[in-house]
Regions:
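Surface-exposed loop/turn motifs in large extracellular/passenger domains
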Residues: 1-258
């Protein structure tokens, strides 16, 4: 898929799982190119009832994508929802072509989810490979309905490489119960992720968490049981948390902010 002259898309899309303004599922061999002199721009609304929903791509496994500006008024789904990419699972490595970046542009727009929502990327994991015979659903993380704890898929292996997200800018508002971040909602525990020179929000931008989103079903409004998340490392008692951050909602030890 590519653009040579006018790299602009506008639509109102509805679906279930794997819904995106450009592609619902972008596999590891796919190529999205833009040879015009203008940034790829997506506008409209993307509304879905399921998982992996993004303003540009629902589920991405490709290692390279073009720069993009997402100017949608709404991106909504159940889990793994991002202003640009819902679930980013590139194979081997991940770059934005020509040193570019992803930006979301409408300050009055919003990203809505029950869990795992990011202004740019909902969920991020660098895969070593995409095993044959494994379904797309099996590659996605699961969330325990009782504890709210997110568990990365064991049907694929995490790559040893590093993902660097540089100069990304989010202007969309975020509405979710748990795992919500201005740039990334949640990063896989083993994926080495560096986020540098990222910007989240304008004066109009607000982070809404903890079951405050009137459009979702409040599936995780009780938050994440922190003791279950921490294992034996800390004792939080019966405390729950939303896991929300201006840049990343759930930052693992392999996550670096610069």
């Amino acid at each position: 898929m590519g653009w040579e002259r006018t790299p602009t898309l506008g639509a109102i899309l509805y679906g279930n799982n794997y819904v995106g303004g450009v592609a619902g599922y972008n596999d590891e061999k796919a190529t999205i190119s833009n040879t015009s002199t203008k940034n790829l721009t997506i506008s409209g609304q993307i509304v879905a009832a399921g998982k992996a929903v993004g303003g540009m791509i629902g589920l991405n496994c490709a290692s390279t994508l073009p720069s993009a500006t997402v100017a949608v008024s709404r991106v909504a789904g159940q889990q793994l929802v991002g202003g640009v990419i819902g679930a980013n699972l590139p194979v081997g490595n991940f770059t934005v072509a020509d040193g570019g970046a992803f930006n979301t542009y409408v300050a009055s727009g919003r990203v809505e989810a029950d869990a795992v929502a990011g202004g740019i990327i909902g969920y991020n994991r660098l895969l070593a490979d995409k095993p044959a015979g494994v379904t797309l659903a099996a590659l996605l993380p699961t969330i325990d309905k009782r504890t709210g704890v997110l568990t990365d898929s064991t049907d694929a292996q995490t790559a040893d490489g590093e993902v660097t997200l540089a100069n990304f800018q989010n202007m969309l508002n975020l509405q979710a119960d748990i795992y919500v971040g201005g740039i990334v909602g949640a990063n896989d525990a083993k994926t080495k992720l560096t986020i540098q020179k990222a910007t989240n929000g304008a004066t109009q931008n607000a982070l809404s968490v903890g079951g405050l989103n009137p459009s979702n079903n409040g599936a995780f409004k009780g938050g994440v049981l922190l003791n279950e998340l921490a294992g034996d490392r800390y004792d939080f008692g019966t405390a729950h948390g939303a896991l929300a951050g201006g840049i990343i909602g759930y930052a693992t030890p392999n996550t670096v902010l610069k």
